Amino acid sequence: MPEPTAHHVGITVADLDRAVAFYTDTFDLDVLAEFSVGGEAFADAVDVDGATGSFAHLDAGGARIELVAYDPEAAGSDPPELYRSGAVHVGLAVDDLDAFYEGLDDGVETLSRPRTTESGTRILFVRDPEGNLIEVLEV
């Protein structure tokens, strides 16, 4: 069996334009591609009759983040809590965590101010406009 390699992290959003603006403005990520997909094969693959999706692929320093808004829109849910089983987050690295934190727009939700863990790692968790968790690490 061929060994798999990581391709992207996918994040489902309700408002693709708002999500793209957040990730490009907050993290200075570049948009690699924007496209829509529909048809019977796609609907079968996502197991939703008649589903279509609008996608944006973003470059996160060689890693790819895929934002996708489905139609029909998925039912909303509570934002994920980091400590709950099944919670997923994206980790993005910055050179200066304090400068990143100070430069955040007022509307960006943070779980705390930048912290240094017992292992010496400097981290900060923020939420995107959809409530998805993003870990920002200083490297």
Question: Where in the sequence are the language-model features?
Answer:
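Haloarchaeal acidic low-complexity proteome signature biased toward cell-envelope/secretome components but also
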Residues: 1-5, 10, 19, 29, ...
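Short hydrophobic-acidic sequence motifs that mark active-site Asp/Glu residues
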Residues: 64-66, 133
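Vicinal oxygen chelate
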Residues: 2, 7-14, 54-63, 70, 77-139, ...
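Core segments of cupin and vicinal oxygen chelate
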Residues: 12-62
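A generic structural micro-feature
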Residues: 3, 47-50, 81-84
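Hydrophobic side chains in well-ordered alpha-helices
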Residues: 19-22, 100-104
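Acetyl-CoA-dependent GNAT
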Residues: 69-75, 138-139
